């Protein structure tokens, strides 16, 4: 299960999730999607609105995280979670799990770490830079489900590259 979140800032303690997007991958294909806005109950900062194009009006009528998180966790149940720069996304998921009393035990993979191993000569390992290097389309960057879908395609390509090099994720 590959996922991405958009937030009101960089601190999982002080900032809020405003969008969660996720896709399930099976046999190298996307087989299911989860996408929702989250009402952060605080105004979205201007810089975040500029980056994501998500406005207060977009999230105003959406459920808050206490409703969305259990749905997201159910979507992820039994899956290894994959994200680009996973420590950021996971810190928000784990903080919200802590706040709402959900278990915080997750198995996750970070495509940035794999990128640093497989694309050694690349100077930037941002989602858009890696996508460009691998020839993967990234539409609506900084929208959660689109970033998750792009990350899924990157992850599938990385798995193929690892198999070709006779490596596995265990060695990374």
Would you name each region that the model predicts?
Residues 106-115:
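A short, structured active-site edge motif that brings together acidic residues
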Residues 143-156:
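Acidic, divalent-metal-coordinating active-site segment for phosphoryl/phosphodiester hydrolysis
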Residues 170-172:
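Conserved small/polar residues in nucleotide/adenosyl-binding loops
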Residues 1-107, 120-142:
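Conserved non-catalytic scaffold segment of RNase H-like nuclease domains
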Residues 7-9, 113, 150:
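Short, glycine/acidic-enriched loop or turn micro-motifs at the edges of active sites
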């Amino acid at each position: 299960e590959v996922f991405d979140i958009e937030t009101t800032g960089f601190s999982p303690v002080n900032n809020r999730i405003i969008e969660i997007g996720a896709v399930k991958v099976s046999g190298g294909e996307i087989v299911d999607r989860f996408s929702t806005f989250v009402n952060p109950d605080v105004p979205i900062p201007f810089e975040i609105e500029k980056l994501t194009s998500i406005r207060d009006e977009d999230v105003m009528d959406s459920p808050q995280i206490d409703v969305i998180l259990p749905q997201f966790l159910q979507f992820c149940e039994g899956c290894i979670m994959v994200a680009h720069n996973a420590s950021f996304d996971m810190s928000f998921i784990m903080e919200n799990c802590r706040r709402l009393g959900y278990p915080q035990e997750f198995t996750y993979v970070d495509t940035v770490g794999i990128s640093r191993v497989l694309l050694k000569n690349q100077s930037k390992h941002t989602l858009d830079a890696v996508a460009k290097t691998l020839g993967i389309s990234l539409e609506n960057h900084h929208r959660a489900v689109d970033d998750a879908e792009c990350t899924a395609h990157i992850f599938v390509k990385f798995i193929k590259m690892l198999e070709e090099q006779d490596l596995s994720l265990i060695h990374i």
